Amino acid sequence: PNLIAGYTCTPLVKFPVASLTPGAKAMGTTIAELGNRNRPTDMIVYKKGGKDYLLIANTSRGVMKVPTDGFAGAPGITAKVTTETGGVGFEPVATLKGVEQLDLLDDQRAIVLTRAEGGALSLLAVALP
């Protein structure tokens, strides 16, 4: 298994859990570039149809559904990504707009805090995509 981390400007990085030891320096492998001028705010893991997914909320690129089945064998990105995104694929979730916070509610739903264009906040339970 891997620990997955998302960082500003937005690499997705895997760290093999077996390599994590107390006090040791951790080196990860960048497996995706999810777009510049962006920051992930929340990331949840869920299972749907027998497959595992990440659902990632971002400041500038909306919510992304990322299948995890290719993570273990995904090659590291070691050169500049010359397109908007690169590495493991993802699917934008167009139905989730203005998401500021995201968490797993149960095995069928997420709970999201959204902000409308006028600034109003809503707390919603939504089906996992």
Task: Please state what every model-predicted region is.
Residues 1-129:
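Sequence/structural signature of beta-propeller domains
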